[in-house]
From Swiss-Prot:
This is Succinyl-diaminopimelate desuccinylase. The lineage of its organism: Bacteria, Pseudomonadati, Pseudomonadota, Gammaproteobacteria, Vibrionales. The keyword Zinc applies. One of its GO terms (biological process) is diaminopimelate biosynthetic process. SUPFAM superfamilies: Bacterial exopeptidase dimerisation domain, Zn-dependent exopeptidases. Coiled coil: none annotated. Catalyzes the hydrolysis of N-succinyl-L,L-diaminopimelic acid (SDAP), forming succinate and LL-2,6-diaminopimelate (DAP), an intermediate involved in the bacterial biosynthesis of lysine and meso-diaminopimelic acid, an essential component of bacterial cell walls.
């Protein structure tokens, strides 16, 4: 039996070694099929990253499918049961790097649009694709640059589905209608280097920092809300000392991270951190990196369309969650867009033997098409 259109495109995409930020020709495959549907294609290359913006129609509302063609490295190939770039079906599961994150979703999007346009060639509004090869990497020259370009010419996305793997047990059981923000602090606490036998003429920055770090770790930053858990504070990295047992270090470097809800702002978190550090009389330098702001789509046409589409296909409404890490949805949401993440099961993403259920890909295609029916038919 021949492959379905979704499975055929998924296999073509998965056979290309598009390890971030490489695209390896994946976008060409998508563009070819979209051009045949009357999409106008705009390729945007920023340094080592390839992106494209495709649009069909010039009316509102503007609905966008967003995703990425890059994948994470495979890891040790000896731990894979199959070649990660030779898509293989075993017991109904499609194995390949990127099967779930997120080339499977990309195939579903394209085929869903093909079917929808065939049935509704004069559909309402406009359909677009925002695709990047820089989601798994530093995310500097990908979606965020395309969004900047669109905003500069006042081309604003109204509604967007990001194809990130949102599901847990079966496709569509969970959709993400928001994400927490991420704020990283790089803190250097300064002391005076010296001999451990003479602490009175040195100043140990590790000892000095510990009470402040303890307070930061136990502070309740907010209580969250109906959609988000309370803001969390974690220290993932800490480095100080020369490696010798008889030297008091002159500095200690601490990296900390907030995953924050819509109940807190960047300014509020930064101000409270500085207040705590100053209260403990530390000599320090502190630099901040805003990795992403929180977003939430708690109402609106898109949320209704997605929930109803999943219910139509699965005969069960999805659970709405905001858990997990960040995604490119955070950049699109800053346009004021309604953003929802709907994609395959995420159990094997970034792991060896990454896989996706073949039947789930067909269901996801149906869901995406039903969303278009609900919004633009």
């Amino acid at each position: 039996m021949s492959d379905t259109p979704t499975l055929a495109l998924a296999k073509d995409l998965l056979s290309r070694q598009s390890i971030t930020p490489e695209d390896a020709g994946c976008q060409e495959l998508m563009i070819k099929q979209l051009e045949a549907l009357g999409f106008t294609i705009e390729i945007m290359v920023f340094e080592d990253t390839t992106n494209f913006w495709a649009r069909r129609g010039n009316k509102a509302p503007l609905f966008t499918f967003a995703g990425h063609t890059d994948v994470v490295p495979t890891g040790d190939l000896t731990h894979w049961n199959t070649n990660p770039f030779e898509p293989t079906i075993i017991d109904g599961m499609l194995y390949a790097r990127g099967a779930a994150d997120m080339k499977g979703s990309l195939a579903c999007m394209v085929v869903a649009v093909e079917r929808f346009v065939a049935e509704h060639p004069n559909h309402k509004g406009s359909i677009s694709f925002l695709i990047t090869s820089d989601e798994e990497g530093p995310f500097i020259n990908g979606t965020t640059r395309v969004v900047d370009t669109l905003q500069e010419r006042n081309e604003i996305i109204d509604m967007c589905i990001v194809g990130e793997p949102s599901s847990t047990a079966h496709v569509g059981d969970v959709v993400k209608n928001g994400r927490r923000g991420s704020l990283t602090g790089n803190l250097t606490v300064k002391g005076i280097q010296g001999h451990v036998a003479y602490p009175h003429i040195a100043r140990n920055p590790i000892h000095q920092a510990m009470p402040a770090l303890s307070e930061l770790a136990t502070t309740v930053w907010d209580n969250g809300n109906d959609y988000f858990p309370p803001t969390s504070f974690q220290i993932p990295n800490m480095n100080g000392g020369t490696g010798a047992s008889n030297v008091i270090p002159g500095t200690v470097d601490i990296m900390f991270n907030f995953r924050f809800s819509t109940e807190s702002t960047v300014d509020e978190l930064q101000q409270r951190v500085v207040e705590i550090l100053d209260k403990h009389d530390l000599e320090y330098e502190l630099d901040w990196i805003i990795n992403g702001l929180p977003f939430l789509t708690d109402t609106g046409d898109l949320l209704t369309a997605v929930v109803n589409a999943v219910d139509t296909v699965n005969q069960q409404k999805p659970q709405l969650l905001t858990t997990g890490g960040t995604s490119d949805g955070r950049f699109i949401a800053q346009m004021g867009s309604q953003v929802i993440e709907l994609g395959p099961v995420n159990a094997t993403i970034h792991k060896v033997n990454e896989c996706v259920n073949v039947e789930d890909l067909e269901k996801l295609t149906d869901m995406y098409q039903e969303v278009l029916n609900n919004l633009l038919a």
